[in-house]
Swiss-Prot record:
Keywords: Chloroplast, Plastid, Transit peptide
Gene Ontology terms describing biological process: negative gravitropism; positive gravitropism; regulation of alpha-glucan metabolic process; regulation of starch metabolic process; seed development; starch granule initiation
Source species, domain of life: Eukaryota
Name of the protein this chain belongs to: Protein EARLY STARVATION 1, chloroplastic
Biased composition (Basic and acidic residues): 118-127
Role description: Binds preferentially to highly ordered alpha-glucans, such as starch and crystalline maltodextrins. Involved in the organization of the starch granule matrix, thus influencing starch turnover by modulating the accessibility of starch polymers to modifying and degrading enzymes involved in phosphorylation, hydrolyzes and synthesis, including starch synthases (SSI and SSIII), starch phosphorylases (PHS1), isoamylase, beta-amylase, glucan water dikinase (GWD) and phosphoglucan water dikinase (PWD). Prevents GWD- and PWD-mediated starch phosphorylation, and subsequent degradation.
Residue range covered by the transit peptide: 1-58
Main subcellular location: plastid
Source species taxonomy: Eukaryota, Viridiplantae, Streptophyta, Embryophyta, Tracheophyta
InterPro entries listed in its UniProt record: Alpha-glucan_binding_chloro
Compartments (UniProt record): Plastid, Chloroplast stroma; Plastid stroma
C-alpha cells in the first residue's frame, strides 16, 4: 500500500507540473527593453509603422512555407522575409491594393521578430539543431521598432574575435509589451577557432503577464578530446521555469557526449516543486564503445509534512555478464521507514541469481533459467549525432595566415559545474 501511495503521489505531482510547464498565454507580439547596442558606430534605427501605411511583404513560396511552419515556430525559428522590392510594373499593376499604393510612406520597411513569450516544455530532452532554426546574419545589424499595439522590439547581430583564431558570430533579438508585463530575449551564436573547436548555441529567457518566468540554453560542440585525440560531439540543454501565481517551478539539465569510437555518455538531472511537494530525478548511461554499459536512475520526492519516497536502480553489463540492483523506499512523517531491496546476477549461461528483502520481513534468494537482455549500444550514437549536426560541422573558422599554428596546449580541467539544488538526505 505504501508503494502504491508513493507512486500515485509522484504521478499526480508530475501531471500538475507538466500542466504548469506549458501554461503561458501567447499574445501577439510582446517585446523587451530598448537595446542601445554595444557596437561602436552602429546606430540604432527606431520608427513606428501603422497598419494603413504598410504594404504586404512579398515572399517566395519557400519563405511563405517557412513562416507558417508550426514546428519551426514552436522552437523559435527566425522568419526570413524577401528583401526584394515590388516587381516591375505589369498589366496587373492597376490592381494593387490601397496599402501597396501607400507603401512609400513607410521606409525603411522593417518587421520585428516573432514573439517567443512561451516557457520551455518539460521532459523534452535535447533538441536537434534543425528544431532551433538558427540563422545568423552575415552583416552587423542594430535595429529596433514599435508596433501598432505599443509593444517594442529589437534585433542586432555582430561578431567577436580573439586569440588562436577565435571568432564568435551572434544574433540577439527580443521584445516587450507596452506595459512591460511580458518580455523575452533570445540569442544565437556560433564559435570556432584554429584548433578545430566549433560551437552552436542558443539562450532564451522571458516572462509573461501572469508572472511566469523562464530561462533556457542549448549548446552543441565539436572538439578534439585531449586524452584520446578523437573527435567528440557534445550536446547539452538547461531549462527552468517558475510560476507567477503559485509556489511552483522546475529545472532540468540534460547532456549527451559522443566520440568517433562509439564511446557515449548521456544523463539528466531534474528538479520540480508544486506548493508543498518537491521531487528530484537523476539518471545516466555510459557506453565504452567496446560492449560495456552502465545505466542508473534515482528518483525521490517529499512533502513539507515530512513524507518521503523514492526508487533507484542500477545495471552493469559486459559480454552478457552483469548485474542489476535497486531499492524502493518510503519514510512517513514520524520517521518510520519502509524499504525493499532487490538484485540480479547474470552469469551469461542462461542462469540468473535473484535475491532481495524488505523491512517487513520479505526475502528471496533463488536461481532461475532466464535469458539476459540489455542494450550494449546506445539507440542514438555517433553516426546519428553526426547526421543531425550538419550546421555545427559546416561552421567555417577564420582563415589562418601562413606559418601561424594554433596553440594546442590544454589547460587544467575546469571546475565542475554547480549541480541541482542540494539533495535531500535519505
Amino acid at each position: 500500500m505504501s508503494e502504491m501511495a508513493a507512486s500515485s503521489a509522484i504521478s499526480l505531482l508530475d501531471i500538475k507540473l507538466r500542466r504548469f510547464g506549458v501554461g503561458a498565454s501567447n499574445h501577439e507580439l510582446r517585446l523587451t527593453k530598448w537595446f542601445k547596442g554595444d557596437q561602436a558606430g552602429a546606430p540604432t534605427r527606431r520608427f513606428t509603422c501603422f497598419a494603413d501605411m504598410l504594404a504586404p511583404i512579398r515572399r517566395s513560396e519557400k519563405s511563405e512555407e517557412r513562416r507558417f511552419d508550426q514546428k519551426m515556430s514552436a522552437h523559435g525559428a527566425g522568419i526570413k522575409t524577401s528583401s526584394s522590392a515590388v516587381p516591375f510594373a505589369s498589366p496587373k499593376s492597376r490592381f494593387l491594393s490601397k496599402q501597396e499604393k501607400f507603401y512609400p510612406r513607410c521606409t525603411p520597411r522593417l518587421t520585428g521578430p516573432q514573439s517567443r513569450d512561451t516557457p520551455p516544455k518539460r521532459d523534452t530532452g535535447i533538441a536537434n539543431e534543425k528544431d532551433w532554426g538558427i540563422d545568423l546574419l552575415n552583416e552587423n545589424v542594430n535595429e529596433a521598432g514599435t508596433n501598432e499595439d505599443g509593444s517594442s522590439w529589437f534585433r542586432e547581430s555582430g561578431h567577436d574575435l580573439g586569440d588562436n583564431g577565435y571568432r564568435c558570430r551572434w544574433s540577439r533579438m527580443g521584445g516587450r509589451s507596452h506595459d512591460g508585463s511580458s518580455e523575452w530575449t533570445e540569442t544565437w551564436w556560433e564559435k570556432s577557432d584554429w584548433t578545430g573547436y566549433k560551437e552552436l548555441g542558443v539562450e532564451k529567457s522571458g516572462k509573461n503577464s501572469e508572472g511566469d518566468s523562464w530561462w533556457e540554453t542549448w549548446q552543441e560542440v565539436l572538439h578534439q578530446d585531449e586524452w584520446s585525440n578523437l573527435a567528440r560531439i557534445e550536446r547539452s540543454a538547461q531549462k527552468q521555469a517558475k510560476s507567477g501565481t503559485e509556489n511552483a517551478g522546475w529545472y532540468e539539465k540534460w547532456w549527451e557526449k559522443y566520440d568517433a569510437k562509439g564511446w557515449t555518455e548521456k544523463g539528466a538531472h531534474k528538479y520540480g516543486r508544486l506548493n508543498e511537494q518537491s521531487w528530484w530525478e537523476k539518471w545516466g548511461e555510459h557506453y565504452d564503445g567496446r560492449g560495456s554499459v552502465l545505466k542508473w536512475t534515482d528518483k525521490w520526492a517529499e512533502t513539507e509534512l515530512g513524507t518521503k519516497w523514492g526508487d533507484k536502480w542500477e545495471e552493469k553489463f559486459f559480454s552478457g555478464i552483469g548485474s542489476r540492483q535497486g531499492e524502493t523506499w518510503h519514510v512517513s512523517p514520524n520517521s518510520d521507514r519502509w524499504s525493499r531491496t532487490w538484485g540480479e546476477e547474470h552469469f551469461g549461461n542462461g542462469k540468473v541469481h535473484k535475491y532481495g528483502k524488505s523491512t517487513t520481513g520479505e526475502s528471496w534468494d533463488i536461481v532461475v533459467d532466464e535469458e539476459t537482455y540489455y542494450e550494449a549500444e546506445p539507440h542514438y550514437g555517433w553516426a546519428d549525432v553526426v547526421g543531425d549536426s550538419t550546421q555545427l560541422l559546416s561552421i567555417q573558422p577564420r582563415e589562418r595566415p601562413p606559418g601561424v599554428y594554433p596553440n594546442l596546449e590544454f589547460g587544467p580541467s575546469p571546475p565542475p559545474e554547480p549541480d541541482l539544488p542540494p539533495d535531500q538526505p535519505q
